[in-house]
From Swiss-Prot:
Antiparallel homodimer; disulfide-linked. Interaction with LMBR1L is controversial. The gene is SCGB1A1. It comes from the Eukaryota. This is Uteroglobin. GO terms for biological process: signal transduction. Keywords: Disulfide bond, Lipid-binding, Phospholipase A2 inhibitor, Secreted, Signal, Steroid-binding.
Length: 91
């Protein structure tokens, strides 16, 4: 659960930072695949960012942990992220 909360907070910090002009579609795709996709689809979504092997391995370990959460929990994390990103605080 701590990992999920950490991931959600990091995601929100990145998406709501004043430096971001909007949500990077590629980043949103990676997060969606991290939470709801298959390990293969997640790995494929990372390729365009050219992570090194250590980064890929860390991401796959996080994917395995997140996949142990119930589907509805992962869907609700996505909904929460979308709600926060669309709030006036992130505009």
């Amino acid at each position: 659960m701590k990992l999920t909360i950490t991931l959600a907070l990091v995601t929100l910090a990145l998406l709501c930072s004043p430096a971001s002009a909007g949500i990077c579609p590629g980043f949103a795709h990676v997060i969606e695949n991290l939470l709801l996709g298959t390990p293969s689809s997640y790995e494929t979504s990372l390729k365009e960012f050219q992570p090194d092997d250590a980064m890929k391995d860390a991401g796959m370990q996080m994917k395995k942990v997140l996949d142990t959460l119930p589907q509805t929990t992962r869907e609700n994390i996505i909904k929460l992220t979308e709600k926060i990103v669309k709030s006036p605080l992130c505009m």
